[in-house]
Amino acid sequence: MKWFLFLLSTIFVQGILGYHVEREYAWRNVTFEGVNPSSYNVLHSIPTGFAYDAETQKLFVAVPRRYPQVPHTLTEIERKKHPERSPPLSKFSGKSSKDLISIYQPVIDECRRLWVVDVGMVDYKEGQPKYRKQNPAIIAFDLTKENYPEVDRYELPAEVVKNPLSFGCFAVDVINPKGGCSDTFLYITNYEENTIVVYDKKNKASWKVSHDSFKPEKDVNIVLDGGKKYSYKVGIFGITLGDREATGNRMAYYLAGSSTKLYKVSTGALKKKGARFDPIRIGDRGPYTEAITLVYDPKTKVIFFAESITRQVSCWNTQTPLDSNHTDVIYSDARFLFGTDISVDSNSTLWVMANGHPPVDDPDIVNNEFYKPQIRLLYVDTRKSIRRTRCDVNGNKP
């Protein structure tokens, strides 16, 4: 416990680090546009993921049904319409062929398709009569067309996933965007089953991959405001894709949520069912740097990590060895508690979300007298974010 108190005190002394980072939105209580506040519980509406469409300046925000009384699981915000700090969330305006049950993360690909994985069930038992259990499904909506029509849907079979509630992050791999969008793969992590579920859109097929590097290493301890301590132990969670090679393959970088080690493997080992899987351990990021989400920026060749317990966003340039001498911090704030999602949009802007809610199996966490939602969404230009850090290998060094 002493090390953790020391770590937190260090962060509070630092105050805010990240001169170029701007806070776009912050919520204590999420509200929904057009929905009577008395019909839902604001403490239960906790966003976990987002995607930003730079062309329309619209944010898509996922609010999973982990608790009762969540009116919409997929929502949107028009930045032009809502310049205020804590805008209400509007129901997703796209057209789905089935009701959306519970979504944790949206992702926009290079073809401007919005992908989601609907886990098909709620996290609480009393909600099953209202939200009838469905097969977990991968769904895509076309953002280039009016009303965002559904353009792909695939229900995942039981042999590839036993518990869809333990899905982590996912990455979308468009093999040749200039040649068309049909040849696409999704790589979905499962932090409880320690697997990656692969979806082949073109052939409407799926399979799972297992490896020891997907497993968690130790419990992660996190202290919420008020001093309440929680622990969790989760396997593979975050995944991001590197630059596309001439063969169409890319490096997939991944990490377990309860580990500080980073691995990579060619997507060629994922795209072919039964292929040999030989990942490379790149290195260890150092003590207390656990994260559940990461993203690669092709412009800077940097991977950014939204860390879980340090209340900071860190970076590592993939052109350098991975160790504590080649990583750095681009943002640190005592109010940035538990990073849940991070992405780079088509304009090379880094976006990162924290919601103050770790992945612990404790329904009473939101009923804790000290619990107060701290949902923050930040953005910064990727080049500006690494200026004068160890991640800026071509610019000014610190």
From Swiss-Prot:
Major location category of this protein: secreted
Pfam families: MRJP
Keywords carried by this UniProt record: Secreted, Signal
Ranges of compositional bias, category Basic and acidic residues: 75-85
Tissue: Female salivary gland (at protein level).
Membrane spanning stretches: none
Intracellular or extracellular location(s): Secreted
Signal sequence, start to end: 1-18
UniProt region (Disordered), positions on chain: 73-94
Gene Ontology cellular component terms for the protein in this record: extracellular region
Family of this protein: Belongs to the major royal jelly protein family.
Function: Probably modulates blood feeding of sand flies on vertebrate species by binding and sequestering different mediators involved in the host response. Binds biogenic amines. Binds serotonin with high affinity. Binds histamine with low affinity.
Protein name (record): Yellow-related salivary protein SP04
Species for this entry: Phlebotomus argentipes
